[in-house]
Amino acid sequence: NILQLSNSESTLEINTLLLGCSTKSNNTDTVGQFGEGYKIAALVLNRLRKTFSVYNNSKDEIWISKFERSEVFNEKVLMFEIIPNHTNNDGLVIEIENVTLDEYNSLYDVWIGMPDAENHKAIETSYGRIFTEKDMRGEIFVNGLAVEKEKNLYFGYDFKPQYITVERDRKSCSTWDMRSTTSKMICE
């Protein structure tokens, strides 16, 4: 019941623990730039009694999120304990414990990059992929992450992040960007 999300190319700097700090701010190849993502995820998952740990291998550290009582605020606050962890591994692994099978299976609905996910027929373009199967009509993804469903679209789309502005909650995107980019994709 452990879910691991890994990226052999990634590393996190300590300042990204601060809300609003991000390593993605100027990276058009990634989704997210607000510096809130993994911190909010850690907060929500801890509230759901899941463990959320970051194996920041390139820094030889493990960051373990947990609630602790703050003497300053007299409240439980989310904090990260940083533990030295000398390893020969590279990259970043985010580990979430206490994941049920139903929770794991629900990830197939929101991320098309899941292991053993259905391989949908698609046309590759420089802007992303156009899904041609009927069951993918109106499905909108950015970099594989489900963003929204647009009933007026004949095809489904997986946009490269540099062409679409995703809203802070990642549940919607700029309609103008989407319409402009879909027309460019179809013209290709």
Describe each model-derived feature in a short phrase:
Residues 76-82, 96-188:
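GHKL/Histidine-kinase-like ATPase module
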Residues 1-103:
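GHKL (Bergerat-fold) ATPase N-terminal catalytic module, capturing the glycine-rich phosphate-binding loop
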